[in-house]
């Protein structure tokens, strides 16, 4: 058994999540976490809403709310979205907890004490019309590296490089379009050059494993070529105070949102441990060198997870050129793998809430089954290349693959057993065809599991559905309905073998399709939970008593979760006439209705 940290990118609390978001961080992390638990590993899956930074400050001002009120609203909305999708977080929390503030400030103090956080003067943007500081995310212009017109003052989303606002060509305010004025200001900078050698050594060990996705590895290696100090504080009054004398009482200086957000993986683990009753439980995932950690996100966040976060960890541990000693958390593990997906587009266009090119998770879940969306993302998502979501393909895949493939196999098998036997029959003497089929389904555990562990989920679900096709083919060729009277014992053997094969397929598909896995289990007389879903729970802050919702759950293997293996079906288990597992869609109606919504 290995302790496996599943660190899931923190959705920003400025609105509901759209399907492009969950295609990058949500479904891939959940499929991996569910499989790893079933395979016997001790998984801790953590995340939460990212609630600091300029966008929330500006949006709250526009809506007549405080930043905390806006964060409270969307913390709940996002938690509900992810709950509906069935993402099995051990803890989904938020970055405005007192616990998170304490962990972040401790990280900053130690990084500063070790000599990797250096105060220096730089240039900050000011709005000429208001005289107020214009945070870097609200300055845009032409990227000096790739020439993209629309780069932000902290990062270019086109090439992924980090920037300073003053580096942009033709800078302008995203709020009112005016040209900002740049004035001198003082900030703390993370000394990346002092950490460059250690970062390069770590990244080389990752490259040597041969496991990282080529695009992620290449991008991360390219970052090493331009290592310069990066500002980790901002001129803003919404965020975590700088925990140093002379700075912490300054209302206009706060820690950079990306400095604090990535520390959330650690603070969420600490909060989970505190809520579990063992304050030190988090250490098994963070300080044990044998533990593994996998970070899931979209490709626009690679920089922060393969450069900034490892640099913070190295600086905290004192492993850069300036030396130093770890703080009270001890030596913290560096990421095992950064699992970044490409982008999902919609009907050939980039997602854009402001332009109405968006499909929110909550809207999909209100009209369609959650496993239909999970299936599309798993089978056709942006794993190694950008992919496009169309309503035509979504509805067609739902009908031809889920309904006509997997759902049809479940329904016809349960119906045949219910009609002809009423219970799972015992098997008589098996034929070569029977043994071949059972070898195919049992062999799927190694193949599908290997694909999931290698973050090749499209191949994994494709192989699982290929096995489903083999079972459907077997049932059609054996024609048990024709031999009820002439050879009832053979009919029972065929139905037993098919029931066993369906059980195996259910397990193979359960990391991808947890909602329907439970339905299939119950359709064949199963009791108890085989595919646990998360709980949306109301809690209070452990330190200041403020209420907020979290996602959590009980995902213990052997108690609520089966082992990743074939489980013998039990003869005599009653089987009643089933109800369809999946809902067939009217493809033309879905396309017309959904495209009409986009145009309204």
Swiss-Prot record:
The GO cellular component terms are: cytosol
**What keywords tag this UniProt record?**
Aminoacyl-tRNA synthetase, ATP-binding, Cytoplasm, Ligase, Metal-binding, Nucleotide-binding, Protein biosynthesis, Zinc
Place the motif 'KMSKS' region on the sequence.
350-354
KW Metal-binding (keyword) present: yes
Could you tell me where this protein is found in the cell?
A: Cytoplasm
One example of a Gene Ontology biological process annotation: methionyl-tRNA aminoacylation
Q: Where this protein primarily resides, as one coarse class? A: cytoplasm
Instruction: Please give the catalytic activity noted in the UniProt record.
Output: tRNA(Met) + L-methionine + ATP = L-methionyl-tRNA(Met) + AMP + diphosphate
Q: Which cofactor does it need?
A: Zn(2+)
Q: Does the keyword Ligase apply?
A: yes
Cofactor binding notes: Binds 1 zinc ion per subunit.
Known EC number(s)?
6.1.1.10
List ligand-binding residues for Zn(2+).
Answer: 143, 146, 156, 159
**Similarity-based family:** Belongs to the class-I aminoacyl-tRNA synthetase family. MetG type 1 subfamily.
What's this chain's function?
Answer: Is required not only for elongation of protein synthesis but also for the initiation of all mRNA translation through initiator tRNA(fMet) aminoacylation.
PANTHER family per the record? Answer: METHIONINE--TRNA LIGASE, METHIONINE--TRNA LIGASE, CYTOPLASMIC
Name listed for the protein in its UniProt record: Methionine--tRNA ligase
Phylogenetic placement of the source organism: Bacteria, Bacillati, Actinomycetota, Actinomycetes, Kineosporiales
> What gene does the UniProt entry assign to this protein?
metG
